[in-house]
Amino acid sequence: MLVDPITRSDLSIFHAEEKFSVFNRLNFTRTDGGREELRQLFERPLSDRLQIEQRQQFLSHLSGVLDQWPNRISNGTLHVVEKWLEYPLDPIAENTASLSNLLYRWLHPADYSMIRYSLPHLIDLVQGCNQILGLLQSFRSEHPLQPELLRMERVLKKSELKQLVSADRSTRTSLLTSLQWARITRYAAKESLHELLNLYYLMDAWYSMARATQELKLTFPIFRETETPYFQANQLTHIQLEEPVGYDLQLNQQHRLLFLTGANMAGKSTLIKSIGIAVYLAHLGMG
């Protein structure tokens, strides 16, 4: 779908005052990074029918597991992980039982405190993503070419992260185990964790789209291959109205003209925008 900035502005997909934007109405993300990913998805509506229908299928499947979505990954969790990956940590010896490591807690107290604080959040990220993969297991088997899910699965299967996948968050780790995991996450698995962060932000955006579809009771549209333009909607409403009145509309070769009349503020512009927003959301793969 090709859309210019003026049309996007006329539909209030985005707005300088967030409360007036369609994006804000549909934003159910839990993280700052997820919000940015969702915004990028909204800026790039799809044009290919197959891609749209695949996203519809994915969001439909996701809607069925929203209540099981892990809560352990919060916005704060991801901020801690991001800070950890960039933190100027003093070196940790490769030999876990070296003297410098045994004395690390006393020689580098600030860094050791950062390690102790960050590790639970790293575990939450890794194990939370592993839970998400479990929730989407059936979708992955039915659609093996879903690239983002395959990337997440590949990252979590890497040997460096396996210890975090199986770690017990409630058990306090020893000094040497903490240093071992700190070294792994800062060196061997650093790029993997960056990739996992970005993948989770995308998952958060998808979660938001599925949650919005469910919460606002949106209906996935059906696309048909026709030689002429065609549009039909039953009980179409404007997504931002609290108590909307639905309209049945049909535009095709037999019904080529929609004539609107009425007093000022009767809702003519709102109805026109409703049609535009419905078409826009349809090309995002939403209802």
Residue spans of the language-model regions?
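Alpha-helical coupling/stalk and coiled-coil linker elements that connect catalytic or binding modules
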Residues: M1-A266, T270-G287
